[in-house]
Amino acid sequence: MSAVKKALDLMKAEEVEYVDIRFCDPRGKLQHVTLIADLVDEDFFEEGFMFDGSSIAGWKSIDQSDMKLIPDASSVYIDPFYAEKTMCVHCNVVEPDTAEAYSRDPRIALKAEAYLKASGIGDVAYFGPEAEFFIFDDVRYSVTPAKVAYQIDAEAAAWNTDAEVEMGNLAHRAGHKGGYFPVNPVDEAQDLRGEMLSTMKRMGMKVDKHHHEVATCQHELGLIFGGLTEQADNILKYKYVIHNVAHAYGKTVTFMPKPMKGDNGSGMHVNMSIWKDGKPLFAGDKYADLSQEALYFIGGILKHAKALNALTNPGTNSYKRLIPGFEAPVLRAYSARNRSGCVRIPWTESPKAKRVEARFPDPSANPYLAFAALLMAGLDGIKNKIDPGPASDKDLYDLPPEELAAIPTVCGSLREALTELEKDHDFLLAGDVFTKDQ
């Protein structure tokens, strides 16, 4: 049965009233327009929907504003929050006169997957992102000619041990950097995260766990690995669910990498593997039971890490996180199990689970662009046999200053990242996956 037929059958079975067509803007934000379900038939999935591209930041000028959304029928799901039964579908953006993919559509991740197959290196790339976030009770900000400020607060925050609370301060709080894995009542968000995970499961997402993270008010939910574009779609759904469930509880969520000074920031560690002919390409007999191809893949990521920062760490706040300490992976080194380098090989007994984890990305990244860029860097490493050098199995932050100074780092600012991308972007242009217009 075709994807379109399945989508139309879902509409009928669920008695759908509306269809929400969604797409991703250059910043990684989900956008949408809602249509009466009566307008959606088989032709709609082929003909698409026209919209004003000049109203999306970074896209068209007003004199060339017409653009078209083409729904991807394989991406449909029922929205869990709308009052009226609504089916959602993610879209690709195309030029209306040529029907060609729009060069600035973040869903170029599809082209990266096609490039992998065409290269002969592998058939499929699997991605497992781990996006952390903070939950607060109160967030205030002000940007005026006289003041620029923001303020955050949460009853569960470590700084509220002496706060006056209406029903009494029960003192069940994790201390500074003490948030990792405590049970309730210290972990006060257990049920909130559980509802988030259950909602994702009802939407058809593959999930596996949830827990409190190290920093005060910091959390993480687990996505089971999937294809590159599928997981980029899932990160958008992940954020959508987390924001909306928290909102229903009277709380607010931020995926900002470093919302407060002096505590751990939020990363989006990205686990990656490549399979070919039904077999894991990264399993072998080299360091940490990796294959030579996996080591070359790591070499590509380490070589291009500074250019990648422009896409995996795209905001000024990203570089408040990428500083020594706070478990931040600023050093361009790799290791098995060692979390102080920017690439880690998680321990596993199963060859099928052998993977590479890039630790420097953060959840402010556009997932389509970040995942596609990471894959392109790794494939460049395999194609050009880029040696990653020896692994670093020590705690790199405990090295003597002279040894630490010899280890290269990721970028320290967005300005540096953009400069590095300008100098090093040819690997992204291979197969026309990215364009200079991107």
UniProtKB/Swiss-Prot annotation:
Which residues are recorded as binding L-glutamate? N264, G265, R321, E327, R339, R359
Q: Identify the cofactor(s).
A: Mg(2+)
Q: Which UniProt keywords apply?
A: ATP-binding, Cytoplasm, Ligase, Magnesium, Metal-binding, Nitrogen fixation, Nucleotide-binding, Phosphoprotein
Instruction: Output the Pfam families linked to this UniProt entry.
Output: Gln-synt_C, Gln-synt_N
Q: Where does ATP bind?
A: D208, N271, M272, S273, R339, R344, K352
Under the cellular component aspect of Gene Ontology, which terms does the record hold?
Answer: cytoplasm; membrane
What the record says about activity regulation is:
The activity of this enzyme could be controlled by adenylation under conditions of abundant glutamine.
Record-listed E.C. numbers: 6.3.1.2
Annotated Mg(2+) 1 binding lies at E130, H269, E357
Report if keyword Disulfide bond is assigned: no
Reactions that this protein is recorded to catalyse: L-glutamate + NH4(+) + ATP = L-glutamine + ADP + phosphate + H(+)
Binding site residues for Mg(2+) 2: E132, E213, E220
As for subcellular location, the record says:
Cytoplasm
One GO term (biological process): nitrogen utilization
Chief place where the protein resides: cytoplasm
Q: How is the cofactor bound?
A: Binds 2 Mg(2+) ions per subunit.
List O-AMP-tyrosine occurrences by residue.
Y397
- Enumerate the spans annotated as GS beta-grasp domain: 14-98
Q: Which InterPro entries match?
A: Gln_synt_N, Gln_synt_N_sf, Gln_synth/guanido_kin_cat_dom, Gln_synth_cat_dom, Gln_synth_gly_rich_site, Gln_synth_I, Gln_synth_N_conserv_site
Give residue ranges for domain GS catalytic.
106-438
An example of a GO molecular function for this protein is: ATP binding
The record's subunit annotation is: Oligomer of 12 subunits arranged in the form of two hexameric ring.
NCBIfam families on file: GlnA
Query: Which purpose does this protein serve, as stated in its record?
Result: Catalyzes the ATP-dependent biosynthesis of glutamine from glutamate and ammonia.
The similarity comment for this entry is: Belongs to the glutamine synthetase family.
What protein does this entry describe? Answer: Glutamine synthetase
Look up and give the organism this protein is from.
Rhodobacter capsulatus
